[in-house]
Amino acid sequence: MTIAIDFVGTNLGSGTKTYNINFCNELSSLELKRNIKIFLCENYLTEINEKIIKNNKIEYIIKPNFLSITFFRMIWMQFIFPFQLKLMGVKKLYSPMNFSPLIAKLLNIKVILCLHSNLPWIHFDLMPGNLVRNFITKKLMELSIKTCNLLIVVSHSAKKEIAEILKLDIKKIEVIYLNINNKYFFLDKNKKLIKKYNYESRYILSVMSCVRYHNIIN
């Protein structure tokens, strides 16, 4: 069975890009039994480990950089991508960025969708962007969720939450926690910082961009 992964995404510094690049690089450590077709924009190639590019089980389908722009990416994803998958004989698609081709199911392509956040249903007012764009984003996410074969979420609380909100079959949802780069994770105690900010000896440092929808409480 040929599997495809859709990493055609933003080139801006973000959690989405980090997720996509790290996912690609981690594949290099696996002994793959099936052929995988990875779709991504040309500007991602400079950040992918050369070892994985040489993996004979992986074929890179390079797309033009303008597809990193959301509007063009959505048009491509919904009206071109699914037919391209069908012509390539792809039977299963992993869509890791909240959206998937809505007609994939009609083309007999199974879709695994990863949902990174329940924000549109829990705090719609905190979504970045204007009201019209956010409304369309939310509806496309809902349709993607309802048409996928398997939904992956990042926590058990997120699983329960989205299942209740969208009336989903709980058996259709799996939990896989997000990870972190090893270069950002280490155990260390800086006595000056602990004393200055009155931290306890054990604490969690959360590395994220300072935006309102990350719900950072000071």
Regions found by a protein language model. Give the residues of each.
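Carbohydrate transferase catalytic cores enriched for Leloir-type hexosyltransferases
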Residues: 1-218
